[in-house]
Swiss-Prot record:
One of its GO terms (cellular component) is cytoplasm. Pathway: Cofactor biosynthesis; coenzyme A biosynthesis; CoA from (R)-pantothenate: step 5/5. Its EC number is 2.7.1.24. PROSITE patterns: DPCK. The lineage of its organism: Bacteria, Bacillati, Bacillota, Bacilli, Bacillales. It is found in: Cytoplasm. Residues 4-199 form the DPCK domain. Catalyzes the phosphorylation of the 3'-hydroxyl group of dephosphocoenzyme A to form coenzyme A. Pfam families: CoaE. GO terms for molecular function: ATP binding; dephospho-CoA kinase activity. Its main location: cytoplasm. It comes from the Bacteria. This is Dephospho-CoA kinase.
Amino acid sequence: MTLVIGLTGGIASGKSTVSSMLLEKNFPVIDADLIAREVVEPGEKAYDQILEAFGKEIIQNDQKIDRPKLGSIIFTDEDKRKQLNAIVHPAVRNRMLTKRDDYINNDVPCVILDIPLLFESNLGYLVDKTLVVYVDEDIQLTRLMKRNEYSEKEALDRIKAQMSLKEKADLADIVIDNNQSVEETKLQLDNVLQKWNIS
């Protein structure tokens, strides 16, 4: 029987680092962010819906969506963010389910669904166990400002747009504390995999 793990965290919490560690161990990882990019490509149903909802001004010369421009709209307008999520989330969920079920049908021991908004989108029912990558907010803020060259306000707006990592940690089956070194995070992940008998 396949164990389905929901991996989540917050922006700049280190979730992608843990996801990469799982890939290195040859676990199949279904990445919601990658799928979210796929489903909004020209020719996809969600692309047409976004164009209809937000207008041509968010389209680049190559006909792809101008993600920074769309991002600046949705991070300052909650109604617009909800509107975008109502288009993108179902498309992402359906594609993730198809991929997950393919792995289950092929009897893989474990599959990871890497979903940043696992709890916000009420997607816990898609997985058997939840794993949250946690980091203190001050470290999260510093990492995000450095990584994306955001001002403190821009970084805080993006952090506040998501459920807090403390709330996510309370909902998780297991939490990986990513405040320390990458080596420490790797050690914690190894312990989790052993605990769940999938190392």
